[in-house]
């Protein structure tokens, strides 16, 4: 089996090293990841400037390609230029922080996996809920258990799974829940300051509201201590609404 790994925390992040170590015995593992942190870049790609690419050896654990670009860039480069053949499986992560609810749209980790699915490759994004101490080694073991189950079930082309691992400082997960994204927005605000040149500067800050119940969703699964598995796809069409919108009295001509 050939596996491609990417992430959005950067090629030197502990999460990608833990993921590599967790799956290294499954076959040939290639790593193509951003040269620095790309959190919350979503599915952005680099079209206005070239990307520098260099080979690196990370902590005597793995060799990989370090890319001055986004996670989706890394996947495109791997699929089109860097690898001599398409991988059988793409993994993205392990991200420092959960990617649940609306975060899926912002997440570079998830975007890397969706980009893999666009290329027809079965893809999985792994994210670890934040806590005081992030145990990526344990998260890697959990990721491997989830992955082994997926492989036994049969890898489907062009599919994407988002796997969120609950905080591990309170013990091992209670199990796995397959569930949709929560329809939950962040409570957001900006911290305002003044820069050295006197211009106003703003820092975005926020958190998911703890008091809002989201039964049978990824957010609630993590709250209950379960691994949340959510199938995703690049098609954002609201098919139920599409049928309704089609019935509107649209103009038949714009001439």
Predicted regions and their residues:
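A cross-family phosphate/adenosyl-ligand binding-site feature
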Residues: 3, 14-81, 85-86
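Short beta-strand segments
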Residues: 6, 32-34, 92-95, 126-127, ...
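Short glycine-rich anion-binding loops that position phosphate/pyrophosphate groups of nucleotides
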Residues: 9, 37, 70-71, 95-98, ...
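Short acidic, Gly/Ser-rich segments with clustered Asp/Glu that frequently serve as metal-coordination loops
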Residues: 9-17, 204, 212
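Alpha-helix C-terminal capping segments
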Residues: 78-84, 111-122
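Glycine/threonine-rich flexible loop motifs
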Residues: 98-107
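Glycine-rich phosphate/pyrophosphate-binding loops
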Residues: 117-139
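Electrostatically charged, flexible surface regions
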Residues: 138-255
């Amino acid at each position: 089996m050939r596996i491609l790994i990417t992430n959005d925390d950067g090629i030197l992040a502990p999460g990608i090293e833990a993921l590599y170590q967790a799956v290294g015995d499954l076959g040939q593992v290639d790593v193509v990841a951003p040269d620095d942190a790309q959190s919350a870049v979503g599915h952005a790609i680099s079209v206005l400037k070239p990307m520098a690419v260099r080979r690196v050896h990370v902590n005597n654990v793995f060799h990989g390609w370090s890319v001055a670009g986004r996670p989706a860039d890394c996947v495109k480069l791997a699929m089109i230029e860097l690898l001599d053949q398409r991988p059988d499986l793409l993994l993205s992560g392990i991200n420092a922080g959960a990617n649940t609810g609306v975060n899926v749209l912002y997440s570079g980790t998830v975007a890397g996996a969706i980009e893999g699915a666009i290329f027809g490759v079965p893809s999985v994004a792994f994210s670890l809920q934040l806590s005081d101490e992030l145990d990526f080694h344990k998260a890697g073991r959990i990721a491997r258990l989830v992955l082994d189950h997926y492989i036994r079930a049969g890898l489907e082309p062009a599919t994407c799974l988002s796997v969120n691992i609950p905080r591990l400082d309170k013990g091992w997960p209670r199990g796995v829940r397959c569930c949709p994204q929560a329809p939950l927005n962040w409570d957001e605000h900006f911290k305002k300051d003044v820069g050295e040149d006197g211009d106003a500067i703003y820092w975005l800050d926020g958190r998911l509201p703890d008091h809002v119940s989201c039964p049978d969703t990824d957010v609630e699964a993590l709250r209950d201590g379960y691994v949340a598995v959510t199938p995703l796809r690049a098609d954002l069409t609201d098919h139920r609404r599409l049928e309704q919108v089609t019935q509107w009295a649209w103009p038949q001509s714009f001439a």
